[in-house]
Amino acid sequence: MPLKPSSSHSERKNRLHLHASSRNAKQQEWNRELVTLFIKLLNENDHASLALVARNAGVPPQLRPAVWPTLLKYHPMVISPNIMSNTLVFKDDENEAELRYFPEDRSEEDISELMENDLNKYFQVRNSVPVSAEIQEIKSLLKECVWQFLRKWNKICKYESGLIWIALGLAEWCPLKNNDDLVLAGRKHHHHNSCLRHLYEEYPIPDELLNQLPDTEFDFAAIYERLVLVLFHAPALDEKPDKSNYHLLKSGNLNQQSQLFFKVFAKTLPELYQPITDEGALQGSKKATWLYWWIKCCGCRVLHRQDRGRVWDVLLGWRPRPESINYYLEYNHKSFESIYPPELKLSSEIFHKICKCEHDEFWFPDLMSLRLGQNGLNQDEDVIRELIRRNKYGDDGHTTETQENEIPYSLLNPHAELLFIYVAIMQHNEFKLLEFEETEITEFLNNVPLISKFDDYNFKKMYEDDDISGSSTDTDESNASGIRPSSSNHMMIEVGTDDKTAHSFDDIYQQAGDIWRNWAWQEMEEFIEE
């Protein structure tokens, strides 16, 4: 006779089920509140608040086709652009550097064939199998979109694979054609023999809310161009290469970003850093391509569409203090003070739900009060020295200036924020990666497991009335990582828990902020020692 499960086991299972149901219900209630808020901000053209909410809470998937164009329209890297050049390259000859120009020398037919090969990898098309008319039309639309970009920017940027994969990633959230909601279903997710799916069927939204959305003023190609300007942004090229390896608050070039990533990775996760660098994940050009997708292409091809969408929410919502724009974009000659209103227009209740301690996630004690680019604070080293001066224990000679009702601006350049998000993802998967063989590590780096399962489930179910327990909540809720201190508590920084538990992208995002503060404090200690 089979044994019956103990009553205590059944009770525990019921408690977990009720806990999961309650947690999902609360999340779905908040998601509905977010949808209403975003629609309100869109109709008021309150793009500053829109950016603040997007980078801290994420954009509901249903609304990305409406929200992303507005975020891009007012993005500083779109208004004052400068992108990584693959036509201008420094050549070092016997310690003498020279900037050389390598224009595109491939024919349009050759480039078109390269695009076709990249598209076939996404759609899993084999040469021996006829391509459906639907896929052929989509491929043509995407190629034309990239061609439009290249015709405009070809002196700076010639074709590389990332351009087509950015277009594919955008098409997973924004329709290729105006006035419909058909988006790409994602790799390996063809839907009813189609590579397209209706966004509002996958992520439902009531008609009365949908009808309130303003018409977008950009077509897909215009959104794509602006997105590339953000993802491929780089500091202006000088006549001589920048030998500095210190680029944190400011943006660095691709090589400097890679150096920063490995520096933070090595300090934060030394036990994991060693096997990953030793076991071949960085050896050989093919094995190291994951770095290109992670850093330059901001998650294209390697992150699931849900996680990549959330990462792009962060990048597109980046907004620094208007008077400090030139600190981050040194080449800029435009004024942003009339574009970005300083006053916070969100209600206090909503603001404290989004910014729980009145900061962006990447905050640091006293950094908000500094006027970067002014008063001798022109380089990252200047800022670090000033932070050290202000944060000495027992230094009562300074009080942090705060302005009431001011938007908490972004303090770290968005591409550096992305690097800390990646380190948080590695930390979340540390135990698993330590047990992996070399081939498994390489597979992980090229196909990062889905993080946003809980978020995705609740955005899909938030307007349903049926059971909301969900299959994505089998684990207990993560322990709170402590309340983040206000900027007046000098250097009393919470580094977060180390339980490797993440139930949503928000957990990873918060952990990334904790890693940033802990690492910045270590940098300051090294500065003091030097």
Curated annotation (Swiss-Prot):
Major subcellular site: cytoplasm
Bias kind Polar residues: ranges: 479-490
Keyword terms: Cytoplasm
Record localization: Cytoplasm
Gene Ontology CC: cytoplasm
InterPro entries, sorted: Rab-GAP-TBC_dom, Rab-GAP_TBC_sf
Residue span, Rab-GAP TBC domain: 58-319
Region Disordered: start-end pairs: 1-24, 467-491
Keyword Cytoplasm applies: yes
Similarity-based family: Belongs to the OCA5 family.
Name this protein carries in UniProt: Oxidant-induced cell-cycle arrest protein 5
Gene designation per UniProt: OCA5
